[in-house]
Amino acid sequence: MSEDQEAQPASQPGDSSARVLPEQLAEVVEEFAELEDRQKLELLLEFSRELPELPERYRNSYDQMEEVVECQSPLFLTLEYDDAAGTAAIFFAAPPEAPTTRGFAAILHEGLNGLRYEEILAVPEDLSERLGLSKAITPLRLRGMTAMLGRIKRNIRAHQAESAPAQAG
């Protein structure tokens, strides 16, 4: 792990099963933890405005991306892998009319993009709960964020399985 990607504990009070989050994701969780519910929603909307544009090669090419059907709004994602570094670049497409979905995607992008496979795979499934959004966002929308994280992890595992025979041979 590089200095700027050191893992930080991201535990909730009384959380005995605290898992370590990558530093950049822990910072986002900490930002949310310091806010009241209404402010958390405002921060989520702020994140939605910060979702990076898709690279040109993916614009108008959603067929090259995976749709996360669990999200209430259309959301597509794709990953690019750097096996030499063991890192993944994550790209999302979500319409501006879906600020909650875009906000979740932007959080995952900021917190996970460019990290090592192992760091991403170690992120706990309860990330949406750690953000403390359960009072501000419906459970269905929170499941969408969990689904995004799940797809990212599944894609990394599939990539590792596909590239393992090539690396062994």
Where are these regions (language model features)?
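Extended low-complexity intrinsically disordered regions
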Residues: 18-65
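Globin-like tetrapyrrole-binding proteins
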Residues: 2-10, 15-18, 146, 153, ...
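Conserved interaction-surface patches within small, structured recognition/assembly domains
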Residues: 80-99, 109-113
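Amphipathic alpha-helical interface surfaces
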Residues: 40, 73, 100-105, 116, ...
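Structural motif
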Residues: 34-37, 95-100, 140
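Structured beta-strand/loop patches that form or line metal/cofactor-binding pockets in enzymes
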Residues: 58-81
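C-terminal binding/interaction regions
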Residues: 96, 118-123, 127-169
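A general alpha-helix detector
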Residues: 27-28, 103-107
